[in-house]
Amino acid sequence: MTPGNTYRNQPIAGALFVLGASFVFAMVGTLVKVVSTSLNNEMVVFFRNVCSLIFILPWLAYSRPSGGIKTTCLRLHLLRSASGLGAMYCFFYAIAQLRLSEAFLLFSTSPIFIPLIAYMWIREEVTYSSRWAIIAGFIGIVLILKPGYGIFRPAMLVALAGGFLAALAMVSIRRMSFSEPAIRIVFYFTIFSTVISAGPLSWSWRSPMPGIWWLLILIGLLAAVGQFFLTKGYSMAPAAQVGPLTYGNVVFATIIGWVFWGETMDYLTWVGAFLVCMAGIITTRRTGAHVLVDASVGKTPER
């Protein structure tokens, strides 16, 4: 657990909060897909960040983490913010270009990359079961991408890159997790990502239509709610118990995509999805890659 979190062993309540977060994240993706028909990716990313910042500031004031917002890990915060923001750009672009289920599925490959990045960066041992899970996960990725079948889309690689960048963000947080409470990590990410994502608006600004404003605000609100639900869930139950439930966002996204857009997946994608999800569950349980956090970027671990 991170500093400032009070742990209570309430697995059922924790599981419900994590499932709730998974559903909220799927709704964020759905709204991003809707507004992406009217706004460019740069606009959507910026408003997601600035709206989340508005809703997270009261949470920060309420939580009052020990030491306030003072940090000794500024470089790691910058790395986490750069990789997390890059993951967000990739994820939102993929949502606009791909089926909702495909975007979520490829972005959810991040737990497969975590052991590899952790080994190369902090020399964290990769367990035997994790090695086989990683191999199975990459086989699943190939089945989803289907290179050579004539139905490959470049946006799939963008979604996959988002998964890798999200994994890099998670390992960055792992490095900070013993000295930084979760709310401080979220605060710095939201501040940095809001400021950085404001830059591209100088050449990409388009005034949203009146109805779109409400959707952008709702995206930010839901992102903050999802953040809170995940934090609450992981304060009530061990990650090994509730971590696998974070893949519920793929299930919810698949259902939403089918209901609203008539999206379906072929049998190779279903097999690939099974392998990726199983690989992610195994590596999450084995490495302790807790998922705490950033609403639309996916997950950030704490220990």
Per-range role (PLM):
Residues P3, V251-R303:
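C-terminal-most transmembrane helix of multi-pass membrane proteins
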Residues A13-G20, L60-A61, P65-C90, P154-G162, ...:
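Loop-to-transmembrane-helix transition segments
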Residues S22-T30, L57, S81-Y89, P111-L116, ...:
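Hydrophobic/small/kink-forming positions within alpha-helical transmembrane segments
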Residues T30-K33, N41, I56, G148-P208, ...:
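Transmembrane alpha-helical segments that form core, pore/gating elements
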Residues S38-G86, L165-L168, Y188-W203:
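Transmembrane alpha-helices of multi-pass small-molecule transport proteins
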Residues F91-Y93, S110-W132, V251-W270:
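C-terminal transmembrane-helix exit sites in multi-pass transporters
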Residues F104-T109, M176, E180-F192, Q227-W258:
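Helix-helix packing/entry segments at the starts of transmembrane helices
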Residues S129-L145, A166, L268-T287:
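Hydrophobic transmembrane alpha-helices of multi-pass small-molecule transport proteins
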